[in-house]
Amino acid sequence: MKKAIFLSFSLFLAFNLTAQKKPKINKNKQAIITALDQKYDELTTLSDKVWSFEETAFQEKQSAEALASYAEANGFKVSRGVAGIPTAFVAEYGSGAPIIAIMGEYDALPGLSQKATSFTKDPVNEGGAGQGCGHNLFGTASIGAATAVKELIEAGKLEGTVRFYGTPAEEQFFGKLWMIREGLFDDVDVMMDWHPGDETKANVQSSLALVDFMVEFTGQSAHAAADPWNG
């Protein structure tokens, strides 16, 4: 009896697995995936550069310039120092609607210097800054995606404008607020954002609210979004 049940269950699984259709990817999406695969080495090099600069809020001069220069070299019109912030920039290609924007960050965090080859605390510079939230990946992958979309617009396969926002000081001082006040996002139709994490998925997600006040904590520190229960 057990053998019969096991055989039936196995046949059921086999039928369902073979019956599932392979998801179709449209031509434009496949072109973007192919373009990003071809840019793998140069984007990895760019990400490693930003990681090595270890620049904190509003000090991201080399990081911002590396990303802005990459955009410029790939045909984007780049506006540097927007909203009165030397390390903020906007890169744009195309014309008209829709205006599709992609966010990028690149600031490091103080005190998180860490060698890439170690999973235990092993700073490059004791007490120095480091990429604690993967913003070297954030900025680089976003500009890579924008570049791949730009190539489709250039080839006449898409219409509209693709825009990359280089946003400094996400972790401290909130550079995006100053960019919002300047109206830099007012004409955007769709803004896309992402963040390094332990899952690969697309979703709509809420964020922590911000009220500006001073608090002094004692005890064990923890990340407010990722593991508040450990603090």
Show the residue positions of the predicted features:
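Bacterial Sec-dependent N-terminal signal peptides
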Residues: M1-P23
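Acidic/His- and Gly-rich active-site-bordering loop/insert found
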Residues: K21-Q131, T140-G160
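Hydrophobic alpha-helical segments, especially transmembrane helices
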Residues: K3-A4, D48, N136, L177
